[in-house]
Structure formats: C-alpha cells, structure tokens
C-alpha cells in the first residue's frame, strides 16, 4: 500500500480556525491522519511511503476565486489549468470577456464547456447591463435559468441609479445577487486630496 506524508506543513482552515504545523498522511487519495509528529515507523512494514518535506508550504481547503478574467491569449481550459495549479477549486468568471457573457446562449455554452472535467468548477456572472454601458438591463432572468449565479458589469460600475434599482428589484425576485464595482467614474482619476470643501 502507498502512503504519502507531507511533513511539517502549515494547515490553514478559516472555517475551523485551524492554523498549525502538522504532518498529513494521505492514503487512497484521502487524508488518513493529521498529527504533530507522525511516526513513519508504523507504516514502514510492507508499505511504500513517499515523504515530502513541506517546511514553508501551506495546505488549505480549496480556494474559490470570485473574480476571474480570461485574458485575450487564454481560453477557458487554460484558465482552469492555471487555477488548478494555484489551489483554486472553483471560480466565477466575470462577464466582460471576449465574447461578453451577456446573453443566455453564451452562459449556457460556457457552463456546458466546463462540465465533466477534473479541472476547477466554473460558475459565471452574467452582464448586468447591455454592453456593460449601465444604461439598459440585460436578460438577467434568462441568463439565470442558464446558470448565471449573479450579475455585474465586472470592472465597470453601474452609474445610473434607476437602472441599479431595477436590477436589484428583479434580481431579488430570481434570488441572484448584483455585484457592483466600487468606483465612481466621475471621481476616479481626480486627486481628491487637492479638493477643499
């Protein structure tokens, strides 16, 4: 039987306030034991043991990245692979990609493309407003039916208060959040420390 031992690895789990250095033993792809000083002699008879010195390394539950941008030179699979290499087990894609995630068929396509893989789970935010302009509400009901877990204009704020009010009212009916980028474009770029009131 094969056992893998991660010696002296820092364990972090915010859900249980765990923050300690321990030895973690893996057997049959599951955690077999966690202890401060695991005695490997117990396993040495008739077992293959792979031991890794993990001093300075950290083990956590899977990390969820809630704001993923897919770059122009990347695609969904390459983004998932990069995420997996960095401990991300689930991710949410922002809508201002190419193509924009602004209609039900694109949301459905992304969800289907990411199913049945061993790569990180993919969720998507649908575009809150058409063309990220903040002027007209997108088809958030239909995008929700196709799997959008929330709605945002990504890295752009929704400036129009009436549009935002309509979005929040409709989103409440379909039990989906509206995520607002916290930036006032009319003020960004100004050196507010120079303005005296």
What are these regions (language model features)?
Residues 1-44:
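N-terminal metal-binding scaffold of metallo-dependent hydrolase/deaminase domains
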Residues 16, 68-70, 184:
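Short, glycine/acidic-enriched loop or turn micro-motifs at the edges of active sites
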Residues 8, 23, 49, 54-55, ...:
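Generic alpha-helical hydrophobic packing signal
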Residues 15, 60, 72-74, 134, ...:
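Active-site-proximal flexible loops/turns
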Residues 195-197:
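Conserved small/polar residues in nucleotide/adenosyl-binding loops
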Residues 38, 58, 129:
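Residue-level detector of flexible, active-site-proximal loop/helix-junction positions
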Residues 80-192:
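Divalent-metal coordination cores built from histidine and acidic residues
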């Amino acid at each position: 039987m094969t056992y893998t031992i991660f010696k002296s690895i820092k364990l972090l789990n915010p859900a249980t306030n765990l923050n300690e250095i321990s030895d973690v033993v893996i057997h049959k792809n599951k955690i077999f034991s966690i202890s401060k000083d695991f005695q490997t002699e117990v396993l040495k008879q008739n077992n293959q043991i792979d031991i890794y010195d993990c001093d300075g390394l950290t083990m956590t539950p899977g990390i969820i990245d809630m704001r993923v941008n897919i770059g122009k030179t990347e695609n969904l699979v390459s983004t998932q692979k990069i995420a997996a290499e960095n401990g991300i087990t689930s991710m949410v894609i922002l809508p201002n990609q190419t193509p924009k995630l602004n209609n039900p068929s694109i949301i459905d396509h992304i969800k289907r493309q990411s199913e049945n893989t061993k790569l990180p789970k993919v969720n998507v935010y649908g575009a809150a407003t058409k063309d990220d302009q903040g002027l007209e509400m997108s088809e958030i009901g239909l995008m929700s039916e196709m799997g959008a877990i929330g709605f945002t204009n990504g890295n752009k704020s929704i400036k129009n208060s009436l549009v935002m009010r309509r979005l929040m009212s409709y989103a409440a009916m379909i039990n989906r959040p509206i995520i607002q980028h916290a930036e006032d474009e009319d003020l960004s770029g100004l050196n507010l420390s120079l303005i005296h009131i």
